[in-house]
């Protein structure tokens, strides 16, 4: 019985999240009502409240799951406590989950903060050759990657993930970020 209930709960949450991600593309979060959401998800209002306190709780849970997804994407690197410069993995994930990432940007979720806890200063120093202003270089890089991802999503991810890596590398004068 619990397996059936768990499957139902997961399916309900999936419907709610899907409806939310569709609505957030055309509305601001404060304009989305539970009524709109349950109507689009084709579920009962009580089903929503079994899973979430309100729309903001739903958004928070989505953000938390997004962060977990990114951590899982780089699980091996997290275990080794070493930053990964494998942006191809990230761009492939974004292309496969476009509405998810569009939703996160719409909710102002700064998933680039992932780098704050994983970026290795030693690697950045090797790349730049100095510790002078390293914090500024790192912030500039994070903002640049974030802007490129937003632009790519707005354009419908027309370019391949491989082309996006080429664009990033060209911004760094062909230098590989891996050293």
Language model segments and positions:
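Append "Primarily bacterial transcriptional regulators
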Residues: 16, 35-40, 48, 94
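Basic, helix-initiating cap at the start of DNA-binding domains
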Residues: 1-23, 27
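Amphipathic alpha-helical linker/stalk segments
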Residues: 22, 26, 32, 62-86
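Amphipathic alpha-helical packing segments from all-alpha helical-bundle domains
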Residues: 107-143, 177
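Short hydrophobic/aromatic patch on the recognition helix
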Residues: 42-52, 145
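Hydrophobic alpha-helical segments that form the core
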Residues: 132-155, 159-174
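Helical hydrophobic small-molecule/effector-binding pocket
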Residues: 79-120
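Short amphipathic alpha-helical segment with a characteristic S/N-K-E followed by hydrophobic residues
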Residues: 31, 54-59
